[in-house]
Amino acid sequence: MKKQSFSVKDLINAGLFSLLVFAAMFVGGIIGFIPIFMPFIPFICALCSGPVFMLYSTKIHRFGMVLIMGTIIGLLFMVTGHGIYVLPGTMLLALIGEYILKKGNYESLNHTRWCFTVYSLASGFMMIPIYITRDAYIQRLIDQGYGQAYADKMMSVLPNWTFLPVLLLGAIGGYLGATLGIKMLQKHFKKLGMA
């Protein structure tokens, strides 16, 4: 059996859509400027990026395309100050998503939706520093000019017990975002024989 390698087009698509998914997540994350909305950032990020991922899924025909995206996005979040845990977490969830897509032979909308749902747990990983380095995170917020009142309000809505619910909100946002993407792209998926 001949091993399929990535074409230049595959790599360009992976890079381009990684940046588009990251941009959609970044737009969703803007609600974080209002500290009481911080627990909902993973939900909004996944909801906003779901349609972009579903469009990307039409370009995925081999194992590794989601892993490339997860690696690029994890690196981008890591270098923008979201901690070191976001990269391995994003890569692990992207790898699990790869197996879900493969099980659906890269043609099943339902498998694609579940791939993105699982992957969207990663949108909560960018918040890990809030939970494990609280004091340092508060000081960083103050140093960046957000002020003590903003930091105190953020921490009041993100006590340690909220980590798992925040992760689950990311998955719910991913499921709904992928579903929204399916609805928006229904004609496109039918043309490709995926719907």
Where are these regions (language model features)?
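Aromatic-anchored segments of alpha-helical transmembrane domains
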Residues: 18-26, 72-80, 119-128
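Membrane-embedded alpha-helical hairpins and interfacial helices in multi-pass inner-membrane proteins
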Residues: 113-186
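Membrane topogenic helices and adjacent juxtamembrane segments
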Residues: 1-29, 142-146, 150, 154-159, ...
